[in-house]
Protein backbone atom coordinates (compact mmCIF):
# COMPACT_ATOMS: atom_id res chain seq x y z
CA UNK A 1 0.00 0.00 0.00
CA UNK A 2 2.87 2.38 0.80
CA UNK A 3 4.22 2.14 -2.75
CA UNK A 4 0.78 2.88 -4.20
CA UNK A 5 0.21 5.84 -1.87
CA UNK A 6 3.59 7.37 -2.65
CA UNK A 7 4.23 6.34 -6.24
CA UNK A 8 0.80 6.20 -7.85
CA UNK A 9 -1.31 8.64 -5.85
CA UNK A 10 1.54 11.00 -4.92
CA UNK A 11 0.94 11.10 -1.16
CA UNK A 12 4.57 11.25 -0.11
CA UNK A 13 4.03 11.93 3.58
CA UNK A 14 3.87 8.20 4.27
CA UNK A 15 7.52 7.23 4.67
CA UNK A 16 9.42 4.04 3.92
CA UNK A 17 11.60 3.05 6.83
CA UNK A 18 12.22 -0.62 7.44
CA UNK A 19 9.75 -2.37 5.13
CA UNK A 20 9.10 -4.91 7.90
CA UNK A 21 6.51 -3.19 10.08
CA UNK A 22 9.01 -2.44 12.83
CA UNK A 23 9.53 1.35 12.66
CA UNK A 24 6.07 2.90 12.17
CA UNK A 25 7.25 5.48 9.61
CA UNK A 26 4.64 4.20 7.15
CA UNK A 27 1.68 4.31 9.56
CA UNK A 28 -1.70 5.11 8.01
CA UNK A 29 -5.27 4.79 9.26
CA UNK A 30 -7.54 2.23 7.62
CA UNK A 31 -11.13 2.58 8.76
CA UNK A 32 -9.77 4.52 11.74
CA UNK A 33 -7.26 1.87 12.83
CA UNK A 34 -3.52 2.34 12.48
CA UNK A 35 -1.69 -0.07 10.20
CA UNK A 36 1.80 -0.29 8.76
CA UNK A 37 1.31 0.43 5.08
CA UNK A 38 4.48 -1.49 4.22
CA UNK A 39 2.74 -4.68 5.38
CA UNK A 40 -0.60 -3.93 3.73
CA UNK A 41 -1.51 -4.92 0.19
CA UNK A 42 -3.02 -2.08 -1.83
CA UNK A 43 -5.87 -4.34 -2.95
CA UNK A 44 -6.88 -4.77 0.70
CA UNK A 45 -7.64 -1.04 0.86
CA UNK A 46 -10.32 -1.20 -1.83
CA UNK A 47 -13.59 0.20 -0.47
CA UNK A 48 -12.04 1.21 2.85
CA UNK A 49 -11.42 4.63 4.34
CA UNK A 50 -7.70 5.41 4.23
CA UNK A 51 -6.22 8.41 6.03
CA UNK A 52 -2.61 9.47 5.57
CA UNK A 53 -0.73 12.34 7.17
CA UNK A 54 -1.95 14.52 4.29
CA UNK A 55 -5.55 13.70 5.20
CA UNK A 56 -4.97 14.81 8.77
CA UNK A 57 -4.06 18.31 7.57
CA UNK A 58 -7.78 19.12 7.28
CA UNK A 59 -8.68 17.31 10.51
CA UNK A 60 -8.73 19.24 13.80
CA UNK A 61 -6.81 16.46 15.57
CA UNK A 62 -4.10 16.67 12.94
CA UNK A 63 -3.92 20.45 13.20
CA UNK A 64 -3.67 20.43 17.00
CA UNK A 65 -1.07 17.65 16.94
CA UNK A 66 1.03 19.55 14.38
CA UNK A 67 0.96 22.69 16.54
CA UNK A 68 1.82 20.72 19.69
CA UNK A 69 4.71 18.89 18.00
CA UNK A 70 6.19 22.22 16.90
CA UNK A 71 5.61 23.89 20.28
CA UNK A 72 7.30 21.05 22.18
CA UNK A 73 10.20 20.61 19.75
CA UNK A 74 9.03 17.08 19.01
CA UNK A 75 10.46 17.22 15.49
CA UNK A 76 14.09 17.11 14.43
CA UNK A 77 14.81 15.33 11.16
CA UNK A 78 11.07 14.77 10.70
CA UNK A 79 11.28 11.31 9.17
CA UNK A 80 9.26 9.62 11.92
CA UNK A 81 6.86 12.54 12.38
CA UNK A 82 4.13 11.53 9.90
CA UNK A 83 3.83 8.07 11.44
CA UNK A 84 3.91 9.48 14.97
CA UNK A 85 1.21 12.04 14.19
CA UNK A 86 -1.03 9.47 12.49
CA UNK A 87 -0.62 7.09 15.45
CA UNK A 88 -1.30 9.91 17.91
CA UNK A 89 -4.41 10.96 15.95
CA UNK A 90 -5.78 7.45 16.29
CA UNK A 91 -5.13 7.56 20.04
CA UNK A 92 -6.85 10.94 20.41
CA UNK A 93 -9.85 9.73 18.42
CA UNK A 94 -10.50 7.06 21.03
CA UNK A 95 -9.01 8.47 24.25
CA UNK A 96 -9.81 11.83 25.81
CA UNK A 97 -6.94 13.40 27.72
CA UNK A 98 -4.42 10.55 27.56
CA UNK A 99 -1.71 10.77 30.19
CA UNK A 100 1.98 10.24 29.46
CA UNK A 101 1.84 6.49 30.12
CA UNK A 102 -1.03 6.01 27.67
CA UNK A 103 0.70 8.18 25.05
CA UNK A 104 3.93 6.17 25.42
CA UNK A 105 2.06 2.92 24.96
CA UNK A 106 0.29 4.28 21.87
CA UNK A 107 3.56 5.08 20.09
CA UNK A 108 5.42 1.89 21.04
CA UNK A 109 5.49 0.79 17.40
CA UNK A 110 6.98 4.07 16.15
CA UNK A 111 10.72 4.60 16.29
CA UNK A 112 12.50 7.96 16.54
CA UNK A 113 16.28 8.23 16.28
CA UNK A 114 16.64 12.01 16.75
CA UNK A 115 14.22 13.63 19.14
CA UNK A 116 13.68 10.89 21.65
CA UNK A 117 10.24 10.26 23.01
CA UNK A 118 9.70 12.67 25.90
CA UNK A 119 8.94 15.70 23.72
CA UNK A 120 6.68 13.62 21.49
CA UNK A 121 4.76 12.30 24.50
CA UNK A 122 4.43 15.84 25.90
CA UNK A 123 3.05 17.02 22.55
CA UNK A 124 0.48 14.22 22.44
CA UNK A 125 -0.66 14.87 26.01
CA UNK A 126 -1.03 18.59 25.34
CA UNK A 127 -2.92 17.95 22.10
CA UNK A 128 -5.31 15.74 24.05
CA UNK A 129 -5.91 18.53 26.55
CA UNK A 130 -6.56 21.09 23.82
CA UNK A 131 -8.94 18.81 21.95
CA UNK A 132 -10.81 17.91 25.15
CA UNK A 133 -11.28 21.60 25.99
CA UNK A 134 -12.59 22.18 22.45
CA UNK A 135 -14.90 19.19 22.71
CA UNK A 136 -13.27 17.48 19.72
CA UNK A 137 -13.19 13.71 19.76
Regions found by a protein language model. Give the residues of each.
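Signature of N-terminal electron-transfer/Fe-S-associated modules in redox systems
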Residues: 2-137
Amino acid sequence: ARAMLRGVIGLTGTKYGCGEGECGACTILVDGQSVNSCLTFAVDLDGRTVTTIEGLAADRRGQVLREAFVKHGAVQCGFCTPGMVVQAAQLLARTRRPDAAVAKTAIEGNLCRCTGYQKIVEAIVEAGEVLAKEGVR
